């Protein structure tokens, strides 16, 4: 049943992604029956030859993973469990994107923002340049992903080394804005910690969503406000 639900979520979210939704607040609970897969676009990662949706659980959704313990997922299947989707309603600079998320071993649920969606050779929605704001057991990372010479390229743009516990929901907040001097910055908050960095490549408007990867991850809600 869970696999059928995951397939439904993936298929139901494939929509014409060139049409941009209106800027508006988003407030989604991922409890059963509380959200609509048609409000989302399932997106392929440029590094992977597959595209996964999410699996509905009792009080959250999870990335697609084999039915094995969390440490086994991380150690043996970390490259096979990437699930990603973005909300059709775009966010804009000054809004806060947030999600309550967790992991059952070490990593790595995240919030993703992307100015636009590219297409895979098969015509499916795929990330080009995008930013990943990642929660894991040793802190927070911001990864800036790009396509360089036709190949995926990424680097760690910012990080904070602090401990986070497994099997514990954390609310991660991300805000892109301009400082008083007009430069763009990203501020990330989680668990009472805060970090920020300057990046003038950050988009003025963007798709925002979630990615589960490198282990079994849980997502309880998602907001753009």
Predicted regions: what they are:
Residues 1-4:
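Positively charged n-region of N-terminal signal peptides that target proteins for export
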Residues 7-16:
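Bacterial N-terminal signal peptides
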Residues 21-95, 135, 164, 179-180:
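Low-complexity, Ser/Thr/Pro/Gly-rich disordered linker/stalk regions
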Residues 67-69, 73-145:
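Secretory/extracellular carbohydrate-interaction modules
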Residues 90-92, 104, 163-167, 203:
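Surface-exposed coil/turn segments at beta-strand junctions on protein surfaces, enriched
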Residues 99, 166-197:
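Carbohydrate-binding surfaces in secreted/extracellular proteins
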Residues 149-171:
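Short, aromatic/His-centered strand-loop micro-motif at the edge of beta-sheets
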Residues 196-221:
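Flexible glycan-contacting loops in extracellular carbohydrate-active proteins
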